[in-house]
Amino acid sequence: MERNKFASKMSQHYTKTICIAVVLVAVLFSLSSAAAAGSGAAVSVQLEALLEFKNGVADDPLGVLAGWRVGKSGDGAVRGGALPRHCNWTGVACDGAGQVTSIQLPESKLRGALSPFLGNISTLQVIDLTSNAFAGGIPPQLGRLGELEQLVVSSNYFAGGIPSSLCNCSAMWALALNVNNLTGAIPSCIGDLSNLEIFEAYLNNLDGELPPSMAKLKGIMVVDLSCNQLSGSIPPEIGDLSNLQILQLYENRFSGHIPRELGRCKNLTLLNIFSNGFTGEIPGELGELTNLEVMRLYKNALTSEIPRSLRRCVSLLNLDLSMNQLAGPIPPELGELPSLQRLSLHANRLAGTVPASLTNLVNLTILELSENHLSGPLPASIGSLRNLRRLIVQNNSLSGQIPASISNCTQLANASMSFNLFSGPLPAGLGRLQSLMFLSLGQNSLAGDIPDDLFDCGQLQKLDLSENSFTGGLSRLVGQLGNLTVLQLQGNALSGEIPEEIGNMTKLISLKLGRNRFAGHVPASISNMSSLQLLDLGHNRLDGVFPAEVFELRQLTILGAGSNRFAGPIPDAVANLRSLSFLDLSSNMLNGTVPAALGRLDQLLTLDLSHNRLAGAIPGAVIASMSNVQMYLNLSNNAFTGAIPAEIGGLVMVQTIDLSNNQLSGGVPATLAGCKNLYSLDLSGNSLTGELPANLFPQLDLLTTLNISGNDLDGEIPADIAALKHIQTLDVSRNAFAGAIPPALANLTALRSLNLSSNTFEGPVPDGGVFRNLTMSSLQGNAGLCGGKLLAPCHGHAAGKKRVFSRTGLVILVVLIALSTLLLLMVATILLVSYRRYRRKRRAADIAGDSPEAAVVVPELRRFSYGQLAAATNSFDQGNVIGSSNLSTVYKGVLAGDADGGMVVAVKRLNLEQFPSKSDKCFLTELATLSRLRHKNLARVVGYAWEAGKIKALVLDYMVNGDLDGAIHGGAAAPPPAPSRWTVRERLRVCVSVAHGLVYLHSGYDFPVVHCDVKPSNVLLDGDWEARVSDFGTARMLGVHLPAAANAAAQSTATSSAFRGTVGYMAPEFAYMRTVSTKVDVFSFGVLAMELFTGRRPTGTIEEDGVPLTLQQLVDNAVSRGLDGVHAVLDPRMKVATEADLSTAADVLAVALSCAAFEPADRPDMGAVLSSLLKMSKLVGED
């Protein structure tokens, strides 16, 4: 019974268990079916999102998305355990359940917009679209991706702001937005990304301050926000980021002090905050960063001394504190940094001596101490730095002998010690420096012979021993320097003959031997220097017939051989020097006539044949072919006869003509009226006859000096001489002029010196003006003159007021005449000295094959057809032209097609005559370079067109606010700016933006890119009035950047002469000898800044007190008179609200003047200019 009861209970229990099991199975089956259905739905959503992503891609040149397609039955849920087909698509990865976790398509050249549907793929963990061409905004819908860990969209064209919705991606640990066009502030909620370890957004247009919430990113390891427009200070809370390893904030607008709290970031290895506006001291607490390897604080406004506590940064490899305002001594404690490889302290105000302890830095490879106030000798133990490769100490007051131990620095490649007070002989043993490539010791007091072992440095490329007191001869061993490109020995006391072996230096580009005591003949071997561009032999004792071998140097642009003893005629072979822009053969004993061959030098800007024994007529055909002469034509002090050729009027750009002291006859040619840019004309000491041409003077209204004395000219002085409003010196003495002295001369307010003596003038001497202080010597020899204190009263005329002729007036007159004469004599010398530095040889692209198109591919840029651009510009209709030059015409265009969405562009169609087929290699090669130049202050190149013999064109972003020229001066091409655009702040902002762009061109790429034509019309203004430098590739496409030899081989005559820059903005060395360096752009930038703040063009007529001035002279005079003087020359449309505004404007003009210095060596680099401008921005609140 009991057993039956037990059995019955067990039976009931089992029945219940079975029922429960059946129910559980049913429930599980139901849940499984629901999960399967849910999974299928999720897959469907993700598939749709992927297809929408593909639809947003307008161009897929590599076909990476070609396999992103759905079969006939679709790609639905998981079937039979297999993953959905889209999990195998290129760049897509899924988890085991078929959910998309990753989209990675870096460097795929995709172009289009990023689809917001990606926000529907809730399982996404990684998005990597690095180095594509996505544009438009970053979709805010990405903020729905709660599992997203990495968002990497670097190197695209994304615009707009950083969506604040991204702060919802709580799993995010890597956010990389660098190299885009993002604007606006960093979202204030960025601190909500508590897992963030890497935050990169460099090279954008972000502004505003660092959000305080960043202090909550306790796990952050990398912060790189460099190259933006961020402002404000670094918050002290940054010291709470204990895991921070890399902090890069360089090239922004940060200001204030560097926070001491940074010293608490013990894991910091890289600190780059250069090129900002930080002020105050370098915190001593930075010495606590014992793991720090790189500290670069240069280009700020830091003051006080270098903290000695930096001795504790024992891991430092690179310490760069240059280009600040640091004072005091160099701390000896820096010698305790055992790992230091680079120490850069240049361009500060450091004083005292160079500490001997620095020679303990045995790993040091770079030591830069230039442009300070250092004195005393270099440490005798400098030779301990056996790994040193660069020793840069120029522009100090270092003295004593160069230490002998320097010969132990056998790795030394660059030793720049010029502009110091070093004395004594060069040390022995320099020949051991077999790695030495640049040795610059110019402008010191070194003496003795040049040691022979110096010529064992076979790797030398530049040797500058100029402006010292070296004596003795130039050794024949100089021929061992086969790699030398620049040899500067001018300004010494070297003697003897120039050795024949000098011809072994076949790579030489610049040879300066002027102002020595070299004698004898120029060696014939000089013809081997086929790359030579500059040859200075002036002011020596060289003799004999001018060597024909010189005229085999077909790359020469400057030839200075004046003040020697050369004899004989000028050879016809001079015609071989087709690139010559400067020719000085003055003060020799040359005879014969002017050869017709001179007429073939169509690039000539300056010609000086004065003080020789040349005779015969001045050939009109030669003069007619010299239409490019811009600066100086001097044929004075020879024996030329005959008439002044009428063709002289074709020299429309010449500024000085001197034909004095010859035997010229006939009249003054009326065609001189064509020389509309003439400042000085000297025809004195000839046998010219007849009257002065009618209507001559109104055409020469820029003249400041006119000397026609010592001729046989007669008739009356024309009344229209009153048109010479700028004349300062006028000498008509020793002629046969008659009649009355024109009363209008008294009204020429600029006139300071007047000589009317030895003529037959009659009647009263005018009152006023220059006549108030005129001396008797300026009037004597005119028996018919009357009036005044020293002359008999005039009969029939009212006696004028008595005048006192003082000795002071005579002294002033003599001084003025002397200064005018000295000015003429100095012109040639100034032009020669101006070329101290020359462009270093640049590698020209060596493109193999006959087809440039096949040789160079520019995948980064879109290629357009002729038809596409014709459709965009209405067949290049003139109504669409927004700019033109001899090199190109720019059209406004609208791209057709759905992909372009009516995108407005600027189409720059190049002139095929100036860009012939021979320039195709340069054109296509430089397109590849342009495609990689990406900066917020450079005009973006969208694409290009190239069809042989049909079109060469660049397609650029269209800028709605036109160019800076239109904004300054007005014009149809640019809308008028709002009144606020004319404040000091806004103009300074433009300068900063242009400087940013040029700094990037000069130092942001593998090699410096020199613009060569910086001017307001090449600065474009976008919708926010942000300045963008354009046209930075034209010079390179014409091969202007190439070494002369390569350029000659690659370019036609049309190409080599087409790109001339723009008059008024060209640096002298570029105008005269086509030398290309970054200092060319610095000069142009200085002129641009002056034009921007004064509203005056550099090519316009500028007067001050009736005296003609260049824009630089006007600004220089104004700055020298202080703030009142500056205020007088500022653009009246510019609002100057406060004294701080005026002071800032004065500071900008002072920087601009330094940029426009005549000597390239005297100009700052664009980095230093930008640093100065950023410091000024703070004063006007431009943060």
Swiss-Prot record:
It comes from the Eukaryota. Residues 876-1179 form the Protein kinase domain. LRR repeats lie at residues 97-120, 121-145, 147-169, 171-193, 194-217, 218-241, 242-265, 267-289, 290-313, 315-337, 338-361, 363-385, 386-409, 433-457, 459-480, 481-505, 507-529, 530-553, 555-577, 578-600, 601-625, 627-651, 652-675, 676-699, 701-724, 725-748, 749-773. Coiled coil: none annotated. Disulfide bonds join 87-94, 167-189. It is found in: Cell membrane. Its EC number is 2.7.11.1. Keywords: ATP-binding, Cell membrane, Disulfide bond, Glycoprotein, Kinase, Leucine-rich repeat, Membrane, Nucleotide-binding, Plant defense, Receptor, Repeat, Serine/threonine-protein kinase, Signal, Transferase, Transmembrane, Transmembrane helix. Interacts with SERK2. This is LRR receptor-like serine/threonine-protein kinase FLS2. It comes from Oryza sativa subsp. japonica (Rice). The lineage of its organism: Eukaryota, Viridiplantae, Streptophyta, Embryophyta, Tracheophyta. The gene is FLS2.
